[in-house]
Amino acid sequence: MIYFLVDRASAFTMRDFVELHAPGLANLVEIVHYEDLLQRQPLHTGTYIFSALDHLTPGGMRVVRELIDQLREPAAESRVLNDPARVLLRYELLDTLHRRGLNRHGVARALDSRSPLRFPVFVREESEHTGAISPLLHDHAELRRALGKSVLRGYRLRDLLIVEYCETAEPNGRYRRYSAFVVSGRVIARELMVGDEWMLKSHGNAPTESEIRDELEYVRGNTHAAQLEPIFSLAGIDYGRIDYALVDGRIETWEINTNPTIRRGRQADPIPIPPEINTLRDPMRAHFTSALEAALRSVDTGLPPRPLAVRFSAECLRNATPMIHVSKPTWLRHVASAIRPALPRLYRLIDVVSPYVTRASRQLRS
C-alpha cells in the first residue's frame, strides 16, 4: 500500500490523477491528510510519500520527522519517500544550485534583500506555486516599491523571495519550460510548455504543431534524464516534479515541487489549446500516464499492510497545531481587502514608505 501524505487543500493533485487518469491505482494509493495524522491511529505499514513539505509549519514538520523515525525501524517494514531531513525546499535548493555553479540565477529572501543581487529580479512566494507576483524589477528602487506593494496586497515579507532573472528565450523569442517527475530515482519526462511569456504557466502554454512534435520526442525519449538525476539527488527529493529551461544546453532549474499537479483535473484549461492542436498531445499524455503509474507501483513494498502503532513525544504534540502554514493569514487578507479601493493612492506613497516597512520587518524578525 502507498500512503500519499498531503494537506487537505492540496490533495486534488494525486486524487484527480488516480480518479480521472489512473483508476488502476485506486486500491493501491491512499491519500492521508496531514491535518488528520495525529488522530489516525493506528497507521499501517507500507510506502509513505510525504508531499507538499513546504506547506508544513515547524510543528507539522516535527510530527512528520517523528513519524519517519518510526517508519524507518526494521520492524515497520515500510518505505519513505521525501524525508524532510534530506529535502531542500525552494530557497535552499536555488541557493545551493547557484553556489555550486549549477544555476546561473541566484535567490535571496525579501527580509535579506541587502544580499548581492544581479538585476533584473522578480518577487515570488517561497512556499506557494503562484509564479512571479511582480514584473521584472531593474534596480533597488523598483524592488523596494514592489515589496511595499506586496505588503499592501496582503503578503508577508518573510514569505517572499527575490529571484534573479535568467534569460532563456529561443532565437525566435519563444520560451520553453520543461517538466519531469521523479519517483524513487526514476526520472519521467512530463511535458514541454512553449509560449511568449518569460514566466510560463499553463495558461500561457501555446504550442504550435511543430512544438508539440518536439514535446512528444522529449517525453518519449526522456532526453534529459541523465542531467536531472543528480539534481534530484542533490535536492534529496524522491517524489516531485522539476520545472526547468535549457541555457546553452545546460539545465537551469526553476523549482522542484513535492506536490505537483500531475495531469489536468476537473477544471478546464484557463486558455484552452485549439482542439485540433490539443489532440496531437494525446500520445504524450498516454505515455507519461503509463510511465508514472508503473513508477508508483514499483515503490510499493509488496507486503500486506498491517497496523502500526505510532507514538509522538509530548513536546511534539504540544506544538503540532497548526500543522499547515498559511501564506496569507485571514486577518491580513481582510486588511488587504479593506484598503483595496485606496491602493492607487497608497502606491504613490510606496517610495517613501517601503524602506521603512522593510526595515521594520527586519527588526521584528531579529
Can you say where each PLM-predicted feature lies in the sequence?
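Extreme N-terminal starter segment of soluble prokaryotic enzymes
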Residues: M1-Y3
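Conserved N-proximal alpha/beta basic substrate-recognition cap immediately N-terminal to
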Residues: R8-L117
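Well-ordered, non-membrane alpha-helical segments in soluble/globular domains
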Residues: P58-L71, Y91, L143-G148, E276-R285
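ATP-grasp fold ATP-binding core
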Residues: S115-I133, G154-P171
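Protein kinase-like catalytic core scaffold
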Residues: V121, L161, I188, G240, ...
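Phosphate-binding site of ATP-dependent enzymes
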Residues: A141-G221, A225-I231
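Short, surface-exposed charged micro-motifs
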Residues: S179, R241-D243
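C-terminal active-site "lid" helix and adjoining low-complexity regulatory extension at the edge
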Residues: I237, L246-S366
